[in-house]
Amino acid sequence: MSNEEQQQPNPAAQAPEGAVTEGAAPEFNPAVLLKQLEEAQAQAQEHFDKALRTQAEMENLRKRTARDVENARKFALEKFAGELLAVRDSLEMGLDAARGETDVEKIREGTELTLKMLAQVMEKFGVEAVDPQGQRFDPDRHQAMSMQPNAELEPNTVMAVLQKGYLLNDRLLRPAMVVVSKAPEGE
């Protein structure tokens, strides 16, 4: 072989596999193509149906979740409110009984029982009173209403509680309003 023959490309050798060469005619079978088309359309319809079902399920889930959240918000206090009804009933009965009563001690006893009942309901639902009398002032749990000089107490000690604070499951619901000690002037 000469050099020229080696460099001449062979058209049949360079054609990719499965490619149609100039002399060969492609196979054309309409029945096979029609069957492939029908299978592809059936598969596409199946995927479309699945997508529609999934979309409908997601929409239903979204609606159900929104309804559940709304109901949870609406009825979150249902048990607490139900327990408070007994306290309200007790207060109403006490007021009715006090209308003709002149014995203040009986009225006081009834009020104390009602307060005890309320405290039990609050405790049952995680509401805890904060009475920081004598404790160090904590700005996260106390609200200082005033400061008073006091030589007997360390500065920043709660001297008096004007209004108790409350926690709900260890989270501050309302800070205690307090009077805080400070060092006397001149010290």
Curated annotation (Swiss-Prot):
Q: What Pfam families does UniProt report for this protein, alphabetically? A: GrpE
Q: Which InterPro entries match?
A: GrpE, GrpE_coiled_coil, GrpE_head
Q: Where in the cell is it found?
A: Cytoplasm
Q: Which UniProt keywords apply?
A: Chaperone, Cytoplasm, Stress response
Q: Which source organism does the UniProt entry give?
A: Thioalkalivibrio sulfidiphilus (strain HL-EbGR7)
Any one GO CC term of this protein is: cytosol
Where do the segments described as Disordered lie? Answer: 1-27
Q: Which Gene3D superfamilies match?
A: 3.90.20.20, Head domain of nucleotide exchange factor GrpE
Q: What is this protein called?
A: Protein GrpE
**Biological role stated in the UniProt entry:** Participates actively in the response to hyperosmotic and heat shock by preventing the aggregation of stress-denatured proteins, in association with DnaK and GrpE. It is the nucleotide exchange factor for DnaK and may function as a thermosensor. Unfolded proteins bind initially to DnaJ; upon interaction with the DnaJ-bound protein, DnaK hydrolyzes its bound ATP, resulting in the formation of a stable complex. GrpE releases ADP from DnaK; ATP binding to DnaK triggers the release of the substrate protein, thus completing the reaction cycle.
Share an example GO biological-process annotation for this protein: protein folding
